[in-house]
Amino acid sequence: MRIGGVEIAVARNQLKTGAALSYINLIIGNLIPLVYTPIMLRLLGQAEYGLYGIAQSIMGYIGLLNFGIGGTIIRYLSKYRAAGDRGREERVAGLFIKIYSVVCCLILAAGFLFAANLQIYSRSLTADEVATLRVLVILMTVNTAVFLPFSVFSSLVLAHERYVFHKLLGMLSSLAAPLLNLALLFCGFGSVGLVASSTVLNFITYGSYTAYALRKL
């Protein structure tokens, strides 16, 4: 596929601007925790923060079920886009959506299995804390599983070298997350509020990737 001079210039501009936004996002990502974390800990409390940390650790292991497929998706999508083979590009995207749908079921099964067997923490946690931990694990599991297939559209945006949109969306998400988290904590929603915040942001972020990919690519 021959690429015109204008398209090359646009691609270079996307790359340069995307790189600049990456550095800005990196700075934001390092500065925000310095301000956000102490406030969050004070509002959440050590005990509930501990529960949130345990739930995140459990989800870290469950998240390994995605097998690091993201990089593979981008590689194949970029390959067929460079070759100008729109048909294969769409088939690959569809294939990975199906694969992720299967992985989604595995994550749901693993998450609910963990949630049903949290009695192993009964010696170190109270009954109420175990109940809260169970709610957190279930919500995080559903959050991870439901949005996983839609990550294909994020990969599609990157494969088409739309770095500016991708990085801007990531930066806005990085800024919105602590603000929404603190708002929910001030309202007394605790650790469950943090998971709800993550769910809302995932819905907006992946919804934006999906809409952009379907309309612009």
What are these regions (language model features)?
Residues R2-G4, A11, I27, I73, ...:
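C-terminal transmembrane helix end/exit motif
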Residues L113-A116, T126-F150, K167, M171-L175, ...:
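Alpha-helical transmembrane segments of multi-pass membrane proteins
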Residues L95-S124, L179-A183, C187, S208:
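Alpha-helical transmembrane segments of multi-pass membrane transport and lipid-handling proteins
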Residues K16, A145-L172, L182, V192, ...:
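Membrane-interface junctions at transmembrane-helix termini in multi-pass inner-membrane proteins
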Residues T17-S22, R42, I58-G60, I99, ...:
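Short alpha-helical transmembrane interface motifs in multi-pass membrane proteins
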Residues Q14-S78, I107-F112, N143, S173-P178, ...:
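Signature of the first transmembrane helix
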Residues M1-I32, G87-G94, A131-L133:
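N-terminal membrane topogenesis motif
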Residues I8-N13, G45-A47, I62-V102, Q119-S124, ...:
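Transmembrane-helix boundary and interhelical linker motifs in polytopic inner-membrane proteins
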